[in-house]
Design a protein with these regions (language model features):
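Metallocofactor- and cofactor-centric catalytic cores in central/energy metabolism, strongly enriched
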Residues: 37, 56, 60-62, 71, ...
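Short, conserved beta-strand edge motifs with alternating hydrophobic and charged residues
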Residues: 187-193, 338-339, 374-378
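Non-transmembrane, aqueous-exposed alpha-helical and coiled segments at domain scale
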Residues: 1-192, 197-307
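Single conserved hydrophobic/aromatic residue that forms the stacking wall/gate
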Residues: 380-388
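Pocket-edge structural micro-motifs
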Residues: 76, 149, 319, 340, ...
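A generic local structural motif
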Residues: 177, 323-324, 360-363
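Short peripheral tails and domain-boundary helices/loops at the edges of structured domains
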Residues: 356-377
Length: 388
């Protein structure tokens, strides 16, 4: 009988979330490096170079890979022979306490994005709790935890469909991907859940994104069953769409396709598609009663030695000095290198600011965005003047 301490769960979750905030999984880094060397589109190649360089800088400086540090999803497999040292907290509460400690860590505070009352006032909880926790009781005497932090851009592109049993899943994915735009920040992965019921398909899709990237190994050895054939079919179809890195066109839109299935009703074929962005963040660990998880940092030497030089079609902009006349000279297709102070806000913030200004209401007292830049996903707003 194994005794698991609640503090080991809390500490392990907190450490894991800090860890994945600045360490890309190495399988993703390696897959992206291969895609970089294969890429023929210069714009897409530049985008992948910047992702890889940013990844290394994040690992070196222990700073977040992306400013959207995500909502936490946790899959917890609890062995039937496990005992807890304390029963004053549920597993959900243990995970939430770990999330709270990770996101309020003074050495590397992470952005809190979780809101209460989603259909009403949408009040930020300030510490990114609660997490979404899936608990499964399994044989054994350990606790296995898979934990991820997923940003809103990719999560918002989730697609769900109830297909007819005879419908072609690969064809549906191929038709669906172009409707998702580039807001899910490719290149990434696709997680596909098939079967069960509607909600089961969604959980399967999310859980599949926790798996190791191995599509190249599958290509080399060939598929051994229908599920692997479907993975390869979707992988090839999606990459032939030419969406490419950050939607700039190119050979690689996804570095892997994952599929998990479950038995389903004879009349049904539920399918859920969840993309993972280039800020892929997840880690797995097992608690066996000997203490908290020991997460070994990767070595910086494991990142590729890739550099990126600004090309001729590049404009350098100091945001402290730029004028409206300067902005009007920017051209579609240019690479703009920004320096200076920039504010970040989600689409909802952008919409609210625009609505206040257009209605004549104005901004709240003490809030003045004039002359400042606000980054909103792919849109940059020069407050009170123009959107470019």
């Amino acid at each position: 009988m194994t005794v698991i301490r609640k503090q080991d769960v809390i500490s392990s979750v907190a450490d894991a979330l800090q860890y994945i905030s600045y360490y890309h999984p190495l399988d993703f880094v390696q897959a992206l490096e291969k895609a970089y060397h294969k890429e023929e589109s210069q714009a897409a190649k530049d985008a992948m170079a910047q992702i890889l360089i940013n990844s290394r800088m994040s690992a070196e400086g222990h700073r977040p890979i992306c400013q959207d540090t995500g909502i936490v999803t946790c899959f917890v497999n609890i062995g039937m022979q496990v005992q807890w040292d304390s029963t004053d907290m549920t597993v959900q509460q243990m995970v939430d306490e770990g999330v709270r400690q990770a996101y309020t860590n003074p050495d590397n505070p992470l952005r809190a994005s979780v809101l209460l009352d989603p259909a009403g006032k949408r009040i930020n909880t300030k510490d990114n709790t609660p997490a979404v926790v899936h608990i499964n009781m399994v044989p054994g005497n350990t606790v296995e935890i898979q934990i991820a932090a997923k940003g809103g851009g990719s999560e918002n592109k989730t697609k769900m469909v109830m297909l007819n049993p005879s419908d072609d899943i690969a064809e549906w994915v191929e038709k669906t991907l172009p409707t998702m735009g580039a807001g899910w920040c490719p290149p990434g992965m696709l997680g596909i859940g098939i079967g069960g019921t509607a909600e089961k398909a969604a959980v399967l899709a999310k859980e599949s994104l926790m798996e190791h990237i191995d599509i190249q190994e599958l290509i080399e050895r060939g598929p051994e069953n229908a599920e692997e054939e479907l993975r390869l079919d979707i992988f090839n179809r999606v990459n032939k769409l030419g969406i490419g890195a950050q939607g700039l066109g190119g050979l690689t839109t996804v570095v892997d396709v994952k599929i998990k299935t479950a038995p389903t009703h004879a009349a049904s074929k539920p399918v859920c598609l969840i993309p993972n962005c280039a800020a892929t963040r997840h880690v797995h660990f097992t608690l066996d009663g000997s203490g908290p998880a020991d997460l070994t940092p990767p070595k910086l030497e494991e990142w590729p030695d890739i550099t990126w030089e600004a090309g001729a079609n590049t404009r350098r902009v100091n945001l402290e000095e730029v004028t409206q006349a300067d902005v009007e000279q920017w051209k579609t297709g240019e690479t703009v290198l920004l320096s200076g102070k920039i504010l970040t806000g989600r689409d909802a913030a952008h919409k609210r600011i625009q609505g206040m200004l257009e209605s004549g209401e104005g901004l709240p007292e003490g809030v003045d965005f004039k002359g400042k830049f606000i980054s909103v996903s792919y849109t940059h707003l020069r407050a009170h003047e123009t959107t470019v």
